[in-house]
Amino acid sequence: KDVVKWAEATGKPYGVYCITLPLKSSASTTPAPQHVVNHTVQVLSGAKFVYFRDSVSLAVAKEYGCTSPIMEFAPDGAFAVDLRDDEKAEAFLNANGLEAGKFLCCIPRLRYTPYWTIPSKKAKMDETKHARNEALKEHDHAQLRQGIIEVVRQTEMKVLVCPEDQTQMAVGKEMLYDPLPADVKAKVVWRPNYWLTGEAVSVYVRSAGLFGNEMHSPIMCIGNGIPAIVCRWAEQTSKGFMWKDIGLSEWLFDLDNEEEMKGIVPAIVAMAKDPKAAKVTAAKALAVVHQRQRESMAEVGRALV
């Protein structure tokens, strides 16, 4: 709506950069009505360019008749995040006995973000979302928890259970940290409080890698050359498929696919056992990201002349 209002008010052209085009949003339990999808495609068709952050979205746009003259893949903007808060990060790591390059990060996530657990949001509990979360929370975290156990028992690495959003400290404690065996828990740190992007990135870049059920922390890791494994599901839209688009299929797992799930723990352990090889894989993906950033931003630049 805002894009349409702006275009009508100014008469200026517009473009769209790095989006996912879902038929059902990650915050919704039902597909978008057809008229909403049609309107979205109409707005995109009026753009001078549309860059999608995953190839699945690009295919959806074409299927629904989007006619923008330039429709291509371009990586999520978060790959370029360079915020840092080294002072806070180092203080946190020192206080918790975490040494640079000697720990992995793990991020939990429920199927739907339970905003109703954040007092400041003043959100009413969504019974449908809550039921879905409860039904699948063990299913969605069992492999991460086992990955933590195997990393601690098979390597010298420690593990930091940390959040990407304000609901995940509690999820991490319940689903990952508390159930761990005593011998493993001794080498696992649970972060009890939220952090801002700068501190989080400064911790990520000091880790040997990250794994979990989130998307943007892995993006920021790869953007800084740090290995990252992504576990996804249908409720998260198609954004996770960007991992395939940048050459990281081996680090993308669909939790709705029981066969794929079998590879999660081995991938986590491999990352911990051979961090040098993992960094080479991350660097190759980052090279793809940089190439597409250069090419797509060049087109944006031409559109602004």
What is each stretch, according to the model?
Residues 1-305:
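Active-site anion-handling motifs in enzyme catalytic cores
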